[in-house]
Amino acid sequence: MTIALSVENLTAAVGGREILKGIQLDLPFGEVHALMGPNGSGKSTLCHVLSGRPGYEVVGSAHLAGAPLLGLDVDERARLGLMQGFQYPVEIPGVKLGEFVAEAAAEAGMGEDEIERRVAEAAEKFDMTRFLQRGVNEDLSGGEKKRSEIFQMAVLGPKVALLDEIDSGLDIDAVREVAEAVEVMRSPEVGVLMITHYSRILRYVIPDRVHVMVDGRLVDSGGPELADELEAGGYEAVRARLGLAPGGENGQAKAKVTDLFTDLPFET
């Protein structure tokens, strides 16, 4: 089992306030891992720190296929093979999707023939052919925007894909659509870390591992059955089983995961 992403004793703070507290995580190539946790638990912060967003005081280590990540800027991490899918993909009117992803592939060192082949194959695989001549994410539904991001990743061929709240703000049909795209993306050449509040997307994407983050710490890991436990009893059930104090230092509400099945966009 070859590790795509390795995170060791990672802490991150903003203005002296610690958000991530000693994160340990291994993501092998070929696996999809789900990272779940209450709002404000630090899930998206982990994604931001790994992708190189500035403004965090970071200690610890993170490696992509054995190469150190910390200290590199966003572009350098992308060239190593780390890509992030965003909660709210932006529209770029006037810049055609096909040209946009082809230029990014050229920047990554791909030749013309390879780019043409990869764009055509991925567009067919993710049902994006009809959008190639349209502005990036222009007039697309929420589900189509998220699928567009996965399409772009498939063309560029990352080693690790970070999918941050990819199901946020989507209705159930769009969640199913995005989940199908994630399943199509599964490959022995890529590790996928899917960050979510909800267990509903895990009805369609069966993760190899589920990790639970509470108050900036990874407190539990297991198979898909861990997501079932969360849906049945909420995060407080996990806290109780692990002997953790209820509510957490951030005053988290004692909500069941099923109570979080709304289409409101959350920032974590």
Feature annotation, model-predicted:
Residues E114-F131:
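Conserved ABC ATPase "signature" region
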Residues S61-R77, N137:
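ABC ATPase NBD Q-loop/coupling interface
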